[in-house]
Amino acid sequence: MAKNRPAKKDNNKEKKGKKEKGVGKRMKKEAMIQAIISVFQSSPKEPFNYKQISKIIGVENQVQKLQVVDILYDLSAEDIITEIDRGRYRLNGLGTMAVGTFARRSNGKNSFIPEDGGTPVFIAERNSGHAMDGDKVKVQLFAKRKGAEPEGEVVEILESKERTFVGKLQVAKGFAFLITENKTLANDIFIPKDKLKGGKNGDKAIVRIVEWPDEAKNPLGEVIDILGIAGQNTAEMHAILAEFGLPYKYPSSVEKAADKIPEAISPEEIENREDFRGITTFTIDPKDAKDFDDALSARRLDNGNWEVGVHIADVTHYVKTDGVIDKEAQSRATSVYLVDRTIPMLPERLCNQICSLRPDEEKLCFSAVFELNSDAVVQNSRICRTIIKSDRRFTYEEAQEVIETGEGDYKEEILALNDLAKKLRERRFKSGAINFDRYEVKFEIDEQGKPVRVYFKISKDANKLIEEFMLLANRTVAEFVGRPPKGKTKKTFVYRIHELPDPDKMENFASFIRRFGYKLKTDGTKTDVSKGINSLLDNVQGKPEENLIETVAIRAMQKARYSTENIGHYGLAFEYYTHFTSPIRRYPDMMVHRLLERYLAGGRSVIQKKYEDLCDHCSSMEQVAANAERASIKYKQVEFMQDKLGMVFDGVISGVTEWGLYVELNENKCEGLVPIRDLDDDYYEFDEKNYCLLGRRKKRQYRLGDPITIKVAQANLERKQLDFQLAE
């Protein structure tokens, strides 16, 4: 259809100085264009003429109405809108359809991520179709103006995520709402009084959205569980778990199944295993640990070498494939470690009793046994099912005291193992392993769950001793399956893999550290790069910028994950690596144990796709668990700082965003935000490339890594947010 531009009136005939009828506030042309496009996008199937458009966007000035006419003509020429009959236009419906994932944000900046990996597309709330974060959707892409970001409209929700949200109930006389704490949903959820499930005003609750009518501002929901009174520690920790879709209690059917598992070991089972009960064996674990899933045995051989057994709880002997316990463990994929509690992958009877390698109790294990010479070179190894009896349970502190003083129980074995571990570690770093030796922030918690002290957990020789032998066992198991003898076909297996770092991220990291006076070579072999990183990490030890540089270095790395396709582990510099040593708390280790049992017995390879899907699930759940752990740490940080409002602390800028500066305090590593709106001495703009905020007039910079002094302004527990102000 021809595009007809309506004739303009001759405005020169107007008398000079005569006020036009309906003169309103003038709009700039670009703002008018955006406003007009928004009208069409909000009602993509409705036609509009220039009068309707003018009224909707608030244009009363006759001159600007004519400008609306011109803009409509131009947008039609660009195929953004279509003229369906003379002077009436509709949004161009010829935009392509795409399928992908919807990302909802409470600030209205929703987006659509195409499954083919294309550019993210902005989805205005009015065009969201009430899709939820993570939904698989079909989107119609709008015709795009040159230079503008792509936009679209959700036309169909193909797959829905669970529509459950955590928050605080607000109960009035005739109605109730859930005030959500979710960063993806700005709208409170309306709850009919008969759907409260006994919930009271101020309770922490989980609510499921059951309906969201097209024209309704708020979705309708029903309470599915009451977590307790908001502010109480258990309620808040359970709320964090629920927020991430993690379970906070065990199904009774699974616990009943665990209760039926016999603890006694039959003589026939012992007969089929290597017997290590007479060999010195002990565990070394954190002092608050209950699930001891690994033990070490050590004895000196007649030839002067040491035989070291890495004994791992034989969980899969008790947990049968596809049983109710296995299905629950597979769903969870990992134990979750919050600040004050552990949410186990397996029922307590298994992880803390039957499978826990407690002292003076006979236990079934899957073991990797090594003969090492005085240089810690493996002379031979074997993987076998065993029975052990631990002689002693050491805490890390107790084992460390033996190492430092040379005195104590089983001192000969511990000192020998420590010497071997140091040599294994030294050789690993020479091969290109990266030494991220960061300290952990820990909280001392009182009986009410309140944090009373922050301290730093530092890895010492006793920790590193255990780490090295676990790494050795994991690598050996992976090599056993992944590197079969000549003439044998490689079989499907579960590997722990770690890709090389992204070159662009490494370049940005190298640029970042130059401001501190450090250099990093980012080209050359992968060993050259890893050795350069290790040299850098050595140089920053004890410096104020140490924690920041290590944090940014870790961000530049890829995330390790599980896969049936082995590509090696870059960070550890291992060609083959897996997770074998923690089946009580990681489902991939259970998969590895089952595959090992099958292949040791000469079994055929399993179907790869089934295990690759399980690998993807476990990698995903590992990340979810880590996010929940971080959320619990953040909650306790805010709680710890509540009585420190107005106090001044030194810190370092740990993050720079368009909305402000994140500052990590030197004293306790608590992190808070200095909002950009509070930087009122200038207008600051975010320079993403240089990790800084730059003042437009005075050119003052706030850069990542800069030292800064702040005052604690606010500690908001509900939002898990600390707000700081500049102290100077």
Describe the function of each predicted region.
Residues 55, 206, 212-213, 239, ...:
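Electropositive polyanion-binding surfaces
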Residues 119-124, 185-191, 669-686:
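A short macromolecule-binding patch
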